[in-house]
Amino acid sequence: EYFVSDFITRGVWFNNGEVTQVTPPETQYLGGETALMDINDSGLAAGYASVAVSPLAEERIADCTPEDEETIVTAPVEVCAWNTWFSLKNSAAGNIEPFSFSFYSRRSNSGSFRANRSIYDVRGFLWQLDSSGNVIGEPQQLGTLMPREEEDENDFSSYAYTVNNNGIAGGQSWTYHPDLDAIKMPAIFVEGEALAVTEDTKYRWGSVNDINDNNVATGYLAEVISSKLRTTGFIYSVDNEQLTTLPGFFTGSSTVANAINDDGIVVGTGEVEATLATRDRAGFMFDSTEEGAEFINLNDTISCDAPYNIIEANSINDSGVIVATALKAEEYTDSEGETQTRDVVVTVKLDPSAADGELNDCTQQENRVERQGASLGLGTLLGFMGLGALISVFRRKSKINS
């Protein structure tokens, strides 16, 4: 007996109890897949959808189909299709990273970047939605950075993760590296065309994670630094075609930029200690408009007795309110009846309206401000540093772009 779901994934619009699904152009096996990742103020939604079965998947699924009626079929073709999809979905991008990769290890069980492949060719899409979440008109299919090479039988896809109020989207696309074969790189989508953020061959992987209404995008790029594959945060001006990498907490710190607001404040996650074998990471805030600005550890912006260790900043709005992921110690009773402590992942909301204008140095009893050469002006410090007010805490459902 087998259970077959109606689809792999569906992009869902939800508002006040109303739910609308977005269906893909191609649904031949397992119902296809769609995702809605972002929506702007005009109801223009960004995401991706299956558009065709890949050549490799067609071949593998065909191998599961008997050529004659006498062959005993032990499982339906849907089981074969699902096993193929599951294997591709969890495959690692081993061609880009021959070394162990400790930072951001949740990308795959082996610690490497997930290739996040599919039985389908997938394309980034923009859907115009009405007030009820229904698609208006014809969706806009987005391109890839390069066309698929003739001998490449794998899925070849693009993905839109963010869209601004000017209709410019950002995300990822498969492309080709001269030495590494197929890789995923950051892409900007303008009028359906996929545009590269960089063509520098030192970069092996990357993504655009957000774009503001000034057409400045942010995300990460992966490159080999000191014989290790590490990520570097970046901002990219679409109008000026200018890429700027972020400094990180220290030289060689793996950094991922997750979001940028219209004031140019970037938030994300980065390694904070260069000397440890297993590097801890922290959520950061960075003013990309300030010359010589340095990363601000968000743990320095909350009170020293706060029970949270902020490990990642996920988003920031134009009021400076940050949604972040934190660890919180929690006691529990084990099977032997003993009290134990474990870290629980929670989401915290940080509000700059509670600013006190000082960074906390929790190693000093007097809790004095130790700026260590930070170059942000006093106005910025007052506006963004004092994020001491914890507004709400709730369980996090994480989203990862591989």
Kindly give the residue locations of the regions a language model identified.
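Residue-level hotspots at or immediately adjacent to binding/recognition sites across diverse folds
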Residues: E1-T380, I391-K399
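N-terminal secretory targeting and juxtamembrane "stalk" segments of secreted and cell-surface proteins
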Residues: F384-G386, K399-S402
